[in-house]
Every structure is written in structure tokens, then in C-alpha cells.
Curated annotation (Swiss-Prot):
Substrate binds at T158, K184, T195, E281, N403, T408. The record marks T121, G122 as: Involved in the stabilization of negative charge on the oxyanion by the formation of the oxyanion hole. It catalyses: N(2)-acetyl-L-ornithine + L-glutamate = N-acetyl-L-glutamate + L-ornithine; L-glutamate + acetyl-CoA = N-acetyl-L-glutamate + CoA + H(+). InterPro entries: Arg_biosynth_ArgJ (IPR002813), ArgJ-like_dom_sf (IPR016117), ArgJ_beta_C (IPR042195). Belongs to the ArgJ family. The active site is at T195 (nucleophile). It is found in: Cytoplasm. The gene is argJ. GO terms for biological process: L-arginine biosynthetic process; ornithine biosynthetic process. This is Arginine biosynthesis bifunctional protein ArgJ.
């Protein structure tokens, strides 16, 4: 089945409140100095939901509470997020605090307790100041205005320099359906689902099981293919909510527009993943690695992520040095079976290696292209038909400075 790309359009200035039924709010309650630090997304109706969580064995209290909510009801109506404190490694008291946040949210928004998800991001190992949290939740008044959605996107940030939002419109059953997303993430990014949070809203009519299948698959190709510093976080999660208020027929794998929905969801996740990679702590450049001609998609993704995660590749890109030897070395370290004699590498569309032979190129032209904000590395294996991509950023002096002083 061909994906109806023509029926998918990016919505400029769209946000998580663009899909029908959603409102949002972000505000400052004092968890961070002079910055927004508490937010909420609320749906007019119980929404079908799906989620993907960190694979870090240490999982923060809010993540455990959210898992409990989604497993119990398979629907959500509100998400409460705080930044500035991760509520991770805070013992039984931390878990009690996360459950209290869920109760407070349910009471404040007038929804069932198990319809509330909780997320936190920030410093690990510090108890939540619940007196501030309690007062803060009581002040949340979500609205359907775009500016409140943007306020939410600010409230979930930690060391991020920019907010991360995206929105698409698609046609399902001949009706307009919207899907949007917001994310935070800058450091500790090396997901298998890093610190990374993402929230997706849509007015598509889709049930939990189907949405979960789609989100899990797409996460593997998008969020799990970004890396900033090779660390995974205790708090990462991606949550999707579907209000169903577009009033289409239920979307499932047999639906004529199934691939249209999947493609739109993938575009949202890919946009957010790239924005996270580009906003890596201290980053000055986005790095995209595409591996083509692999035997399997998994092998292509593994090689791409190996390259983009290499500190030597990252520092070379930061220094605008076309040291492709670091790229070929990373390929060899990936533990994927390759044929060194068939590999081709291009850097910013300039061939640097072909059939194990170094290629002559203009140093001046290469230097100019490496000054660009987005760097693309293409690797051609010539072993099969599969492809895979990964995204990351350069490694700068500023990264060390930011993380050396994070708590202070």
C-alpha cells in the first residue's frame, strides 16, 4: 500500500492543543529560578493512550505511577509534568509523592485518578518539595490557546535551549485529522527510550492496542535513534493521547488510511527527535547519519547510531575536520558483518571513500560545507536493500562546562 503523503501537511505554528479536545498550561511555581516548571495537558474526554518508557533499570517514581495508570485504564485524560526535579532515586517517599501528584491532578481537573499520568525531569536524588507542588497544581488552568501550549513546552525544559514542538494535518476517511507533539531533551540522550520526555496529541479515533503498536515501532526508528552523550535517563517516556474527536471510523491496520496515520505519527516523532539532537547540551551542529544498502534495517540502524554516538566523530564535526577515518572506524566497531571493500562514505554529499579507496576532494569546499548547522553523513554498504538513520550532535567544550556545573 502506498502512503498518501499528499494528504499529510505540516501545520506551521501548530501545537498540542491544535487537535480537537486538548488544552494545556505551563507556569512557574518556584521549582526553578525564574522559569516555568509545572505544566499540564488535559483532554475533554478520556483519550486512548500509549506509552514507551526508558529501559534504564533505575526507573523514577513518576514513570512507575504513569505505568500504573495506563496499564489499569488504557486511557488518559490529564498529564502533569514538573521540571527541575526528577523525583528519581528518592525511595518510598518519592513514590508516595508521585502518587499524590496523580491524586491532586485528578481532583483539580475532575477526572478519574487512573486517567492521570505524571512525569518529572531534573536533578536526580532530591526529594520533591511537595508543598510547592501542591500549591502549584491548584493554580493550573489549561486553555486551548496556542500560547498556553507554548507555555507548556517551556515548563518541561531543563538544560534545553529551545522548545520543541511540531504539528501535522492528515486526511482520514476524507476528514481532517490533526496530530501534534512536544518534547524536551538535551543531555543524557541515548534512548532506548534519555533525559527525554515527549507528549503527542491527536484527535484520531484509534484504540490503545493499535496506537501502542504504532508508537512502539516508530519509537525504534526515531527517538531510539538519537544520541547526545550516550547516557540513558531514569525518567524518559513518550506518551500519546488520542481523543477520537475527529469522528472518523476507528483506525486500525485494516483501515484504508492506516499508513497515512502511521506516516504522520512518524513525522511528528522524527521532527521531535531531530530537534532534541540539535539541541544537545553545548551543541552547535545537528549530525544525521544515513546507512544504505544494509542486509537488515536493524543492522543499518545499529551502524548509524554507532557513528553518531562516537565521541571522536562528534569532536571532528565540532572542529569542522573531515576526518572520515573516524567514521570508518566506528562502522568497524558496530559488530555488524560488513565488507570493507564495498563501503562508500559521503560527508555533506562529498565522496570521501569508495570501494576502500580514499577519494580526492577539495579541502576548501569541504571546510565550507562543514561550517553548516546540519551535517549529513551517508554510508553505502552495498550488501542489501535496507536503510536506517540516526541523529546526534557535535561535542563541544560547552558540554563539559554545562554538566560540570549542573547542580550548581
Amino acid at each position: 500500500m502506498m502512503i498518501k503523503i499528499a494528504s499529510i501537511t505540516k501545520v506551521e505554528n501548530g501545537s498540542i492543543v491544535t487537535p480537537k479536545g486538548f488544552s494545556a498550561i505551563g507556569t512557574a511555581i518556584g521549582l526553578k529560578k525564574e522559569k516555568k516548571d509545572l505544566g499540564a495537558i488535559v483532554c475533554d474526554v478520556p483519550a486512548s493512550c500509549a506509552a514507551v518508557y526508558t529501559t534504564n533499570q533505575i526507573q523514577a517514581a513518576p514513570l512507575q505511577v504513569t505505568k500504573d495508570s495506563i496499564t489499569t485504564e488504557r486511557k488518559l485524560q490529564a498529564i502533569i509534568v514538573n521540571s527541575g526535579n526528577a523525583n528519581a532515586c528518592t525511595g518510598m517517599k518519592g513514590l508516595q509523592d508521585a502518587y499524590e501528584m496523580r491524586v491532586l491532578g485528578a481532583e483539580h481537573f475532575g477526572v478519574k485518578e487512573n486517567y492521570v499520568a505524571v512525569a518529572s525531569t531534573g536533578v536526580i536524588g532530591v526529594p520533591l518539595p511537595m508543598d510547592i507542588i501542591r500549591k502549584g497544581i491548584a493554580t493550573l488552568i489549561p486553555a486551548k490557546e496556542e500560547n498556553e501550549a507554548h507555555s507548556f513546552s517551556e515548563a518541561i525544559l531543563t538544560t534545553d535551549l529551545i522548545t520543541k514542538e511540531t504539528c501535522y494535518e492528515m486526511s482520514i476517511d476524507g476528514k481532517k485529522v490533526m496530530i501534534a507533539g512536544v518534547a524536551k531533551g538535551s543531555g543524557m540522550i541515548h534512548p532506548n527510550m534519555a533525559t527525554m520526555l515527549s507528549f503527542i496529541t491527536t484527535d484520531a479515533h484509534i484504540e490503545h492496542d493499535v496506537l501502542q503498536t504504532a508508537l512502539s515501532q516508530i519509537t525504534n526508528h526515531t527517538f531510539n535513534q538519537i544520541t547526545v552523550d550516550g547516557d540513558t535517563s531514569t525518567n524518559d517516556m513518550v506518551i500519546a493521547m488520542a481523543s477520537g474527536l475527529s469522528e472518523t471510523k476507528p483506525i486500525n491496520m485494516e483501515h484504508a488510511d492506516w499508513e497515512t496515520f502511521v506516516f504522520a505519527l512518524q513525522k511528528v516523532c522524527e521532527d521531535l527527535a531531530k530537534k532534541i539532537a540539535q539541541d544537545g547540551e553545548g551543541a552547535t551542529k545537528l549530525i544525521e547519519v544515513n546507512v544504505l544498502g544494509a542486509q537488515t534495517n536493524e543492522e543499518a540502524k545499529k551502524i548509524a547510531k554507532q557513528i553518531v554516538g562516537s565521541s571522536l566523530v562528534k569532536t571532528a564535526i565540532h572542529g569542522e575536520d573531515p576526518n572520515w577515518g573516524r567514521i570508518i572506524s566506528s562502522i568497524g566497531q558496530s559488530e555488524v558483518a560488513i565488507n570493507p571493500n564495498t563501503i562508500e562514505i559521503t560527508l555533506q554529499s562529498i565522496a570521501v571513500l569508495k570501494n576502500s579507496e580514499p577519494q580526492t576532494f577539495s579541502e576548501e569546499e569541504m571546510k565550507e560545507r562543514l561550517q553548516e548547522d546540519e551535517i549529513v553523513i551517508n554510508v553505502y554498504l552495498h550488501l542489501g536493500e535496507e536503510t536506517g538513520s540516526a541523529w546526534g550532535c557535535d561535542l563541544s567544550y560547552e558540554y563539559v562546562k554545562i554538566n560540570a556545573c549542573y547542580r550548581t
